[in-house]
């Protein structure tokens, strides 16, 4: 006679559910870690490509577009000039041929997949998740002669949220600061740079906006500190906490930076201000500890 199959008891069912829950609990952090690593690797590649684009642009001792804090309508932004070297040559040629450019154009290489502030619906900002070192790129500097501290010791690009606390960062903008929509939630447009040492004047402000936090070098041997003591960069701030005067990273483990020699480093959240700002100056003469 065929025996009937014994049904699973309630206790056995609960045990199975508990085991599955434990396994899921063990797997989720691992999956999250894999995803975070993939995002970091993608962002690392983007930053490296941006620096290599600068090297290609600078062939023949060609000077970079000056980031001196002032507006020059006859020139394009640094990141616009790098477009042919970040897989955007067709778009660049169209702009040059027509004399016009579309500020709403999205450049994939300029966006970090980890940047939580990227807004796909914002079609007028030319968002950028990476910022060029304005302090090092003043006065039409040249790759071969403007970095006495060494290209391996000077930051070229740092991570930066594309939006933060009323401010949008744009690869298209040539100005340190402009006003787009006064009174709205994001009424300021800052070009995709950090460490701008120039105060910003705008017709909608009764007083000039303060400059970015930038390095001040003094002493013998030379040491650099931020123009506001103790500040370096922000680690995973909320949108409301974003300080447009500083760089930001979405990675808990530290901020990715591309050096002028093409290498990419991770700066720890607790980095000493003197070390960080010493890496921002191209000719400060500081001794940077590894």
Positions of the model-derived regions?
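N-terminal single-pass transmembrane signal-anchor helix
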Residues: 4-39, 49
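Internal low-complexity, small-residue/proline-rich segments
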Residues: 32-290
